[in-house]
């Protein structure tokens, strides 16, 4: 007896749009962050309707069933949506359960005015490279990968004496490379970076001729801090300031000596990195690095 193959008739075709997808990027490793994050989205006008992103096969964090956007997600074509569609505001919150990256929050407006993945909109010169993804920076609890240097310390506001939280730190090497980190609520920071290239590589011709071993190698680095807490924007329902406002803070003064000394403050601090050792940056005579927003009293 021959098997009877049932006939099927297409009754309905369902089409769904993904209105928010994000590629997270690790600038220290110059690689995508494909797992380990908890990414949530909450309507500003209804904080009880938080949804969590799912991870696609390619490591993109995406959202479905976004509150208030069902019509746009299921619209068959653009003509059925209307032009332009109304926008809604949401709080995007990112946390890393394993503690590799600093948690951040940002208000986003949906639907996006462009197709494709979310691009964080920061000022020109901001460290975030939107062409690669949404950059997250190393936390103080992250273990540096092999052959990576760690520039770390504790920031203190020279005016208030309180921890300088949510500052953006930049470490620049002589070859022009820049590496970034954020200070946490206690002012602690950690900037991870690969060791700068040696001028002549091992095994090359001619070989290194200065007689120094690898563990005797040093490099000059330049540290700068962007810190202007008065310019930070709050995020509704969050204890974190807006990520974009953190990245766009103004330049701060760094005090190599205690504030009030004849040396004063500088917008950059040049110091030396030693191979194989964390570089703990501090103001002379204390364990913290004193900074202040430019224009504030000290």
What is the role of each PLM region?
Residues 1-33, 111-150, 154-163, 181, ...:
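Beta-strand-rich domain onsets/edges
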Residues 19, 36-38, 89, 150, ...:
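Exposed beta-strand and adjacent loop surfaces of beta-rich binding modules
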Residues 29-46, 159-174:
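Short, ordered, surface-exposed loop/turn motifs in non-cytosolic proteins
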Residues 36, 45-76, 175-198:
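Short, acidic Ser/Thr/Gly-rich low-complexity loop/linker segments typical of extracellular
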Residues 54-55, 60-120:
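N-terminal accessory interaction module
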Residues 79-81, 178-181, 210-212:
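Beta-strand-rich interaction surfaces with strong enrichment in secreted/lumenal proteins
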Residues 86-98, 199-210, 214-231:
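A short, solvent-exposed beta-strand micro-motif common in secreted/extracellular proteins
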Residues 98-128, 229-280:
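Structured interaction patches on ligand/partner-binding surfaces of diverse proteins
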